[in-house]
Amino acid sequence: MSGAALGLEIVFVFFLALFLLHRYGDFKKQHRLVIIGTLLAWYLCFLIVFILPLDVSTTIYNRCRHAAANSSPPENTNVTGLDASVTPAPRQHPCFKPWSYIPDGIMPIFWRVVYWTSQFLTWILLPFMQSYARSGGFSITGKIKTALIENAIYYGTYLLIFGAFLIYVAVNPRLHLEWNQLQTIGIAAANTWGLFLLVLLLGYGLVEIPRSYWNGAKRGYLLMKTYFKAAKLMTEKADAEENLEDVMEEVRKVNESIKYNHPLRKCVDTILKKCPTDYQEKMGRNMDDYEDFDEKRNTYPSEKSLVKLHKQVIYSVQRHRRTQVQWQILLEQAFYLEDVAKNETSATHQFVHTFQSPEPENRFIQYFYNPTVEWYWECLLRPWFHRTLAVVLSIFSVIVVWSECTFFSTTPVLSLFAVFIQLAERTYNYIYIEIACFLSIFFLSICVYSTVFRIRVFNYYYLASHHQTDAYSLLFSGMLFCRLTPPLCLNFLGLTHMDSSISHQNTQPTAYTSIMGSMKVLSFIADGFYIYYPMLVVILCIATYFSLGTRCLNLLGFQQFMGDNDMTSDLVDEGKELIRREKRKRQRQEEGENRRREWKERYGHNREDSTRNRNVHPDPKESNFSDTTTNWSSKYTRANNRTERDRIELLQDAEPLDFNAETFTDESLEPESGRYQPGGRYLSMSSSIIFEDI
């Protein structure tokens, strides 16, 4: 099993990152470099979280082995008469190798590759790719130029901060500049910035995640919040549609002014490809390609203005598409919550859906998750499950807050994480150590990463599921992950006293902390900021518990969901009305589809079968009778008189009623139903088809 656990986790984490990226990104529409860069950033960060428990168990085993090697083994001396025979007692090794043991020399190389690759991504490559993806240039050179200009200030800020650390080290006479110390300064600067963001996000997640599960057990609360989201999303949806209309109007003007032989026509064609299909068709119909451009007669937009317009088109189209998909998802969620509220009082104990699922369900799932099981889960078991999970997560949050405030105390050990790990270390229970480390890091990561997935900066950065996240937001999330994960793991090692700078013991460090270097170069960070700044998580948790941030945003005009607010009540009522309209609209659509399906099943097959039989097997009696009638009429009848001809012409000009089951619907009553044919004539049905089903 040597190294097998490491290989299995490397493969598993890759597919986990790929699955999450597929949920939020779009592999078909987004650029391959964006997908690869984001996947690599997420993959490396998840690797740190999953592999660190193996590093901890391996380090504990190496410490035990080192302590056993330094201790002198007892010897049994047997003296008989004049001859003294010294027989050493058999050495009993008190340590046993863990199942996930990683050989020496592998972990330091692994951590160096993972850490420095992630730092290269977050500080150099991903910011450049972010500006490149957001650029509206029409060529690779133009996009690279724009990205370099936008990142000049960005990179200059980093150089300024790093230069300040260099000056501090150079002025300090006790320190001598070496490559390892310069490397430590860079790592300290990156971890300081990451720890600053980490505490802010952690303080929010420690309270909000348990509270969200507790509120998840309240059906009325979730339904009201969904109505509130519907009202806000409808406003955003209308704003996105209006913004798209304005941008498309500008594109139409540019498209009409720049003709086919203009030098900038290729740029306009590139912009048109980014527009929705219906707008492309409208602009194509209104385009007159036979007019030559006259540079002296008209004023044409410059290439710089087209670049700006291209950027606006990309953003507006993405935002419009995202709001449309989110609106459909929110409707399904609202309909589901309303169904749960109705089924709670059901006496049959069977869950009944108002609308059928748009996606066909698996037969295996339908067999086990039948309406009865669904009713017991949704109406009885799920609320209690959410409450239990909320209590467990609240206990974890209290343990984290207590440990963050007391992890610097070594005598006595007050950090609960350190107490649990040290108890397991005495018995060398490696399975328990790895499980405890993984659950602790996983909970901290969930609190931080879930906040990253939830934050929303003025619609500029937003992670949306169902493949609706744009390239800029994906790259920005990769940058945040790479900046937050290393300080998160260092903070966890400090909570468990596996970091020698916290425990103040001369013990073998983990391979992860060994690549970070000694923080004694920057004592004010190692002994000050790293220890006392995490205590602010208490203040942030209190502020989150009392929703101080939500109240401040509400006062600034950004409506947030608050139960005791008049604005919230108004938005809830508005959202409820919107959901009711959409529900009524969908019901009418389903009723129309059901009516058409019933007419088609009742009359469509009979008509097809009778028509097929009539054409393939004609009745001989009918054919003989028709031939006889034709011969008799042609033989004994002369030309019709004027009265009969007039009556026949009137009958021919009259509109026959169309009783076709496929076309006799509510839609056929509309003036543009498609029944009118070019030339001013309507479709009519022959007498054989009309009376066929009688």
Swiss-Prot record:
TM spans (from-to): 4-21, 33-53, 106-126, 151-171, 187-207, 388-408, 433-453, 474-494, 522-542
Chain positions found as Phosphoserine? 633
**Ranges of compositional bias, category Polar residues:** 625-638
Residue spans, topological domain Extracellular: 1-3, 54-105, 172-186, 409-432, 495-521
A single Gene Ontology CC annotation of this entry is: plasma membrane
Using the UniProt annotation, give all residue ranges assigned to the region (Disordered).
582-638, 653-680
Q: Is Mitochondrion found in the keyword set?
A: no
GO terms for biological process? adrenergic receptor signaling pathway
Coiled coil stretches, renumbered = 228-260, 571-603
Give residue spans on the Cytoplasmic membrane side.
Answer: 22-32, 127-150, 208-387, 454-473, 543-694
Record keywords: Phosphoprotein included? yes
Compartment(s): Cell membrane
- Keywords associated with the record: Cell membrane, Coiled coil, Glycoprotein, Membrane, Phosphoprotein, Transmembrane, Transmembrane helix
Protein origin, superkingdom? Eukaryota
- Biased composition annotated in UniProt, kind: Basic and acidic residues: 588-624
Task: Describe its membrane topology.
Answer: Multi-pass membrane protein
Residues linked to a glycan: 78
Which family does the entry's similarity section mention?
A: Belongs to the LIMR family.
Q: What does this protein do?
A: Recruited to ligand-activated beta-2 adrenergic receptor/ADRB2, it negatively regulates the adrenergic receptor signaling pathway. May also regulate other G-protein coupled receptors including type-1 angiotensin II receptor/AGTR1.
What name is this protein filed under? G-protein coupled receptor-associated protein LMBRD2
Q: Whose protein is this, by species? A: Mus musculus
User: Gene encoding it?
Assistant: Lmbrd2
